[in-house]
Amino acid sequence: MVILLETIQSMFKHLHWANQRILENLQNSAAENKQANNLFSHILHAENVWFTRLMGSDSSHLPIWEEVSLESCVEIVNQNHHNYAELLSKLSITDLDQVVSYQNSKGTVFHNSIREILTHVALHGQYHRGQINQLLRKADLEPINVDFIIFKR
């Protein structure tokens, strides 16, 4: 079980590294890619929504698909990183199986373990970063390598 906690912590270090790489690329791009910005904003909002749920608070008022400026993305990336780093530093192995009850944006109640939620957050961002890379390729731009193994090298 200790290995599981270390793996989740490593996944979140990768998540932050990958977010920073995407953000830097979007900031340095000559042409604004509105779709890529929208997807990146969504990744960051979703991370915040899930953190709020993990804290036992209502997330229904939080945006999920609201596009924000790249300047705001910098702040959100840093805040999300701080929030999750603090949470992960305090989690014990037994905490991972604790069940969290929350409502989705439609008001439906769900119950998932902290382990399941943290795994979802890490994988959700990777999915959308892949979509961002697809948009970059379509615009004849170089995709950003955010593979986990690159992070570990």
Predicted segments, located by residue:
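Helix-adjacent hinge/juxtasegments
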Residues: 59-98
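Short acidic-hydrophobic surface loop/beta-edge motif
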Residues: 100-102
